[in-house]
A protein has these predicted regions:
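Active-site microenvironment for binding and transforming phosphate-containing groups
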Residues: 1-203
Length: 203
């Protein structure tokens, strides 16, 4: 894995107007929406991934332990921003987003670069047996002190990318664990409302 550049920024540090941001009202789903110029500055209801080919249209996803996944097809000039939590990952939202980029914009998965931002790591993501079963045994990386399964959710996202045809060399995964790092928002650790914002925008 490769470290993804992760920084705190305020509005004055953004290279686009905050009023242009397109976000989504996340519902832990596999619902994906295509964003066009008419949606600039809006919140898209009831979805967990956004795709656009419009320039200078920033897409925002909010997370606090879930995996933020950004996709960039340099050839077709298409980007996507994905909130891949437990439910979304189980429902294959990352794979489905790649498929929508291919079907709606003509993207070739081999041209897509993917990056995952800070998220909860396998040492910290404790789930029950039923949840672990839904993920599959290969993503169980150990057991907690209470003998509950520990899941590597980023590896599940990575497999979806690879199975879609995205090259392993084009997948970058942040090594920052939100649960282990107090400077990053973590629902598991703090049960707080604070969120990490992940942006992607075509210049």
């Amino acid at each position: 894995s490769t470290n993804v550049d992760c920084r705190f920024v305020d509005n004055s540090s953004l290279f686009f107007p905050p009023a242009d941001i397109v976000s989504c009202r996340q519902i832990h789903s596999d619902v994906i929406k295509i964003v066009d110029e008419s949606m600039r500055g809006t919140e898209i209801p009831d979805c967990d991934a956004l795709i656009t080919n419009a320039p200078n249209l920033p897409l925002l996803i909010r997370t606090a332990d879930c995996v933020p996944v950004v996709l960039f097809d340099e050839c077709r000039r298409v980007v996507a921003n994905i909130h891949s939590g437990r439910v979304g990952t189980q429902k294959q939202i990352v794979r489905k987003t790649v498929e929508m980029m291919r079907s709606q914009f003509g993207s070739s998965p081999s041209d897509i670069i993917a990056a995952m931002g800070p998220h909860i790591c396998g040492k910290c993501y404790e789930v029950d047996a039923a949840c672990a079963s839904e993920f599959g045994e290969k993503f169980v990386v150990g057991f907690s002190k209470d003998q509950k399964p520990l899941i590597d959710i980023a590896s599940a996202c990575k497999e979806q990318l690879e199975s879609s045809g995205v090259y392993s060399k084009n997948i970058f995964i942040s090594e920052i664990c939100t649960a282990e790092s107090p400077e990053w928002p973590s629902w598991r650790r703090d049960k707080c409302s604070e969120r990490l914002g992940t942006f992607i925008v075509l210049e």
